[in-house]
Structure formats: C-alpha cells, structure tokens
Amino acid sequence: MVPLIDIAVESPRWTEAGNEGEDPLSLDALVEAAIGAAVARAGIALHAEAEVSLLFCDDAFIRGLNHQWRGLDKPTNVLSFPSDEDLEDARLLGDIIIAFETSAGEAKAEAKSLAAHVSHLVVHGFLHLIGYDHEEAEEAEEMERMEQVILADLGIADPYHGTAPVAPGGEAQVPNEALETSGKRQDHSLGEILPGGMSRRLAGS
C-alpha cells in the first residue's frame, strides 16, 4: 500500500523549469512512482493511514535545516526526518526535504536528467524513513543495493555505476556529494517549518 503523500513546494524553481533543455518536473507523478516502487520492493507493512510529507525547497532553506538539525552550515541535496514511532504503527512516517539548486547542479554535473536524480533522492529519503541508513559500510551497501533495484524498476540507470559506492568511511556516495543522512524528527512537522509555499495531497492506494 502506497502511503498518503503530502507535497509542499517552497521554491518556485521547482515549477519553473528543469535543467537546460528539460521540461519542468511533474513532481506529483515522480514522487508517487518513486515511493510506490520503494514500498513494493521493501515489502513493508504500513499503517492503513500512513502518510509521508515532502518539501521541495531551495538551498537557503535546506541550509538552515541542515544547520539546525545536523550542525552543518551548508546546503545539501536531501534531508530525511523519520518518525520515532514503530514503522507498523506510524501514521506519519516522516518528512523528506529536497533542495533545487544542489539537486539540479548534481544532475547536470553527473550528466543525468533532473527527473532521474530527484527520483533517486526521493527513494533515498524514503528508505531512511522506513529504517535504512548508511552510517556503517554494511548498512550503506544494503541501502545502495535497494536503491539500485528500486530505480531499475522505474527504468532509471544505476546511480552508482562507475563510482565508488562505499567510501572508506562507510558513507554511500555519488559524484560531488554524498546523499545526506537522516536527522532526528524531534516531534516537528513540515507544518511547523514551512514558510507558506504551495502544498497538495496525493491519495494513497
């Protein structure tokens, strides 16, 4: 069962255009496909009213969150804030935040479409919400394998192909910057941190 999906768009960059030569992203369809594929492959049982929230923002906004929750005063591509409830009981699985400038820059540098890269970031963020991590080398390898299979189901090439999937320190990496780890939820929600962008809800199935 795909959870209910809440999407909020804080930065107009997400709705104006993709990278050069690309059409604007269809965020609703992209997110629903990515999370649906992740749920199917992970084989998880979710609460009937499970919900996940996504915020599409700019680098300045995610930099503030990264500094507040992880002590890193820099923008990043994606942050995840899992619920502290047990997965099978959680009505709110958590939040995924993705920044436009960093994500678009990575996609361009890696010669991949913005849609493919953002799909990867959504999958990566959602896997954090359901318990995957990459703090240790073994965890990173397991998470990367799951990402590769899910993205293949979506018709997206292996994002780690030609790179060192696991760095010596155990971080899962892509060119330019590692996909970011999750933060602690600390009982916050996107409703508390969102400055008033566009939002919409997709029905689960």
Swiss-Prot record:
Protein's cellular compartments: Cytoplasm
Pfam families attached to this UniProt entry: YbeY
Enzyme Commission number: 3.1.-.-
Cofactor: Zn(2+)
Keyword Zinc among record annotations: yes
PROSITE patterns tied to this protein: UPF0054 (PS01306)
The record's free-text note on cofactor binding: Binds 1 zinc ion.
Top enzyme category: hydrolase
SUPFAM superfamilies membership: Metalloproteases ('zincins'), catalytic domain (SSF55486)
Location, primary (coarse class): cytoplasm
Family per record: Belongs to the endoribonuclease YbeY family.
Name of the molecule in the record: Endoribonuclease YbeY
Source organism per UniProt: Beijerinckia indica subsp. indica (strain ATCC 9039 / DSM 1715 / NCIMB 8712)
